[in-house]
Amino acid sequence: MATWSGFNVSSSPLLRLRSSSVSNVTKLPFLSPICRRRLLAERFGLATVVVTRQNLTVTPSSAAVEARISGKREPMTPPYNILITGSTKGIGYALAREFLKAGDNVVICSRSAERVETAVQSLKEEFGEHVWGTKCDVTEGKDVRELVAYSQKNLKYIDIWINNAGSNAYSFKPLAEASDEDLIEVVKTNTLGLMLCCREAMNMMLTQSRGGHIFNIDGAGSDGRPTPRFAAYGATKRSVVHLTKSLQAELQMQDVKNVVVHNLSPGMVTTDLLMSGATTKQAKFFINVLAEPAEVVAEYLVPNIRAIPASGSMKPTYIRFLTGIKAYTKIFSRVALGARKNRYVTEE
């Protein structure tokens, strides 16, 4: 086996013929490791050359190079293994039902062991032994790690992890009037909890040969617009988009191709969280005009989520239920035709 510049070269005939070319490329200090590999792949045509400080290996690359260009891998075959945080009620529960209807296996969790038990029992009555549940406080790293262990014990691996757990502390008031407890609750759940879940989800999926997809759910404020009377909630949801982009960049820097972080936007969903804020004329107007039941939203989101692993796509995606066009169309219908007035709450 030949060596040069502190690197070992495999005895592949292809490498022996091209050794001078390889040496020239790997000695270019201004090229990143990724760029060097790309140049080597182009130079050899039929092989991807991976350089490490220990050895230089050759792997078949026609599919790999094509996957790098297209952003795709081999499609994942359903049924999928799904994990959803904050999934004993609201949109989380509706998503769980929709995945189960599609034939997938689902792990649900909540801070309340009682709610988990009730939700699992209800879902098992409808879908059989394809659902598991456990107590988990996403603001506690130990709980999240135990959630991963629980999922691996029952399902071996997770294909899709949806970070849905969130809180507004059921508090709608100016920030100046917010209590310490409410602010801590919102920030710990929506920001720290999301970070802990993303960290553990990525660490788990990086050990899985099939990788996986992580979806972070946004909310009011994620687009940068003001959220008066729930400023803390809006600020934490704005951070969701930033965190997702940062994680996408980190995975790209590490040349990770089989783990992807996406954003998921359910829009306005008629959950307890949303309806608790229907206290002003403006809030009631927009809830009636734009909000939809969790079941309707889940029916749209789940097929779009499942389509990503099914296609083999490994490109970051932002799936939106309520697009700008949909929102403006609904508002126009309301203003022009009076549509959806008093649909959920009575407007004064």
UniProtKB/Swiss-Prot annotation:
Transit peptide residue numbers: 1-61
GO terms of molecular function: chlorophyll(ide) b reductase activity
InterPro entries in the cross-refs: Chl_b_Red, NAD(P)-bd_dom_sf, Sc_DH/Rdtase_CS, SDR_fam
GO BP: any one term: chlorophyll catabolic process
Localization, UniProt: Plastid, Chloroplast thylakoid membrane
GO annotation, cellular component aspect: chloroplast; chloroplast thylakoid membrane; plasma membrane
Chain residues that bind NAD(+): 84-108
Reported consequences of knocking out the gene: Slower degradation of chlorophyll b during dark incubation.
Record keywords, A-Z: Chlorophyll catabolism, Chloroplast, Membrane, NAD, Oxidoreductase, Plastid, Thylakoid, Transit peptide
One Pfam family in the UniProt entry: adh_short
CDD domains cross-referenced by the UniProt entry: SDR_c
EC number: 1.1.1.294
The keyword tRNA processing is annotated on this UniProt entry: no
Enzyme class: oxidoreductase
Membrane topology: Peripheral membrane protein
PROSITE patterns, A to Z: ADH_SHORT (PS00061)
Function: Required for chlorophyll b degradation. Chlorophyll b, chlorophyllide b, pheophorbide b and pheophytin b can be used as substrates. Belongs to the chlorophyll catabolic enzymes (CCEs).
Similarity section: Belongs to the short-chain dehydrogenases/reductases (SDR) family.
Assembly: Interacts with NCY1 to form a complex that acts as a chlorophyll b reductase. Interacts with HCAR, RCCR and the LHCII complex. Part of a SGR1-CCE-LHCII complex, which acts in chlorophyll breakdown.
UniProt miscellaneous comment: Chlorophyll b reductase activity detected in vitro with a recombinant protein produced in a heterologous system. Able to act on the substrate within the protein-chlorophyll LHCII complex.
Name of the protein described by the UniProt record: Chlorophyll(ide) b reductase NOL, chloroplastic
UniProt organism field: Arabidopsis thaliana
